[in-house]
Amino acid sequence: ISLEGANGCCYCFVESDGERTFLSDHGVEYSFQAEWLKEIETDPFDYIYLCGLEVEEPTGLALVQSVSQLEGQVIFAPGPRGLLIPKDRLEAIYDLHPILHVNEAEALAFSGCREIQPAIEHLYQRTGQLVIVTLGENGAVAYDGNWYEADGFPTEVVDTVGAGDSHVGAFISARLEGLDMTQALRFANKVSSQIVASKGVHLTKEQQEALRTELKQK
């Protein structure tokens, strides 16, 4: 795909406690055109990962409409800017019955609740699908009419860039390998804990191989 226009960039500021702040200048890489999907295989997918950043853009509605025509379980991670997504577009995503993957602050903000348990239940009532909430060092919790919990892995936080993306990616991988909900949450917590203990978003080859081996042995 080749587009006319300027590319964007993202500056990541990581503080001494590992917390990060992004300054993003969105370019053509955040845009979407429905005809792009005509050139790729669109057979049924196990999961379709939808990120809030792209949905927020002017072409986000076209993206949501295209995703609605695909066969597969949508997993939606709105991210911290998710509340900037137009309400009608957000409702269109909820109508796809996506798995929601959010952190605690996002769950409270999207639900309008003050406590995490009713917040999760409120989001589940809207989507009718699994809601996953990451809780930092306290692990993660999920709800689909039943509750699932998995403890976190103690670690020294160096850089939180990639914590959420690595968690949702690891969860998807674990589920595809046949792990049950609690096992998948635990594996995702482990991967995320290793990411935040490293500078940048890449694990060493040794870490990657160890995680792959662990996943295959479950």
Feature names for model-found ranges:
Residues 1-2, 14-99, 104-148, 179, ...:
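Ribokinase/PfkB-type carbohydrate-kinase core domain
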Residues 5-8:
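Short acidic/glycine-enriched loop/turn segments that link adjacent beta-strands
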Residues 116-218:
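Conserved phosphate-binding/catalytic region of the ribokinase-like
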